[in-house]
A protein has these predicted regions:
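Phosphate/diphosphate ligand-binding glycine-rich loop within oxidoreductases
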Residues: 58-66, 71-184
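Positively charged, low-complexity intrinsically disordered leader regions
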Residues: 2-78, 82
Length: 185
């Protein structure tokens, strides 16, 4: 993709209403408006074009992307890490298989609220995969979201990281949107 095409995509992005996506989590595809979904596709195309043209996509000079997986994963974990790297974020992997991770304090009674705030220090984004139990994954993501919002509001966190659903019990928005963009192209 050439620079002219990239500029045209950026211009078309300006015509979309995606204001609600700023400082907002991305949990479920059906919670987003058509403009927000279209804007997400445009940003993906712009990033692809920049990458193909060997133009840096770094938006961050430093920062963290937290990869919180409560299930096994290869493709999704690697894709999230690659996306964070493309934007200039270092990735910290926090793997908590079904909440019983003996390497964390969860096994010793640490609450979701405590864990969420602890892993959120200096974080810009948290990608969560929790798809093992119906009725649990999406609820867990909302609990984490509420905890980091509370931590930010109360001054525990200097910034509030955005949460991205990397797969839950009711939706896999990153995969759905990647599949749709593949079909579109």
């Amino acid at each position: 993709m050439d620079k002219i095409r990239i500029r045209k995509l950026i211009s078309s992005l300006a015509k979309r209403d995606y204001r609600r996506t700023y400082m907002n989590d991305f949990f479920l595809t059906w919670e987003k408006t058509d403009d927000e979904i279209a804007a997400t596709f445009l940003v993906a195309e712009i990033l692809r074009g920049l990458r193909e043209a060997n133009i840096s996509c770094r938006m961050f000079d430093s920062g963290l992307g937290i990869s919180l997986f409560r299930d096994n994963s290869t493709r999704t974990r690697f894709s999230f890490a690659s996306a964070c790297n493309l934007l200039g974020l270092e990735v910290q992997h926090y793997i908590d298989i079904s909440g019983l991770d003996s390497k964390s304090q969860i096994a010793h009674g640490e609450t979701v609220r405590e864990t969420a705030n602890m892993i959120s220090f200096m974080a810009d984004v948290i990608g969560i995969r929790d798809d093992m139990y119906i009725g649990k994954g999406n609820a867990y993501m909302h609990t984490v979201s509420e905890a980091v919002q509370e931590g930010y509001r109360d001054g525990v966190l200097e910034q509030r990281p955005t949460l991205v659903n990397l797969q839950c019990d009711i939706d896999h928005p990153t995969q759905c949107m990647a599949d749709m963009l593949h079909i579109i192209n």
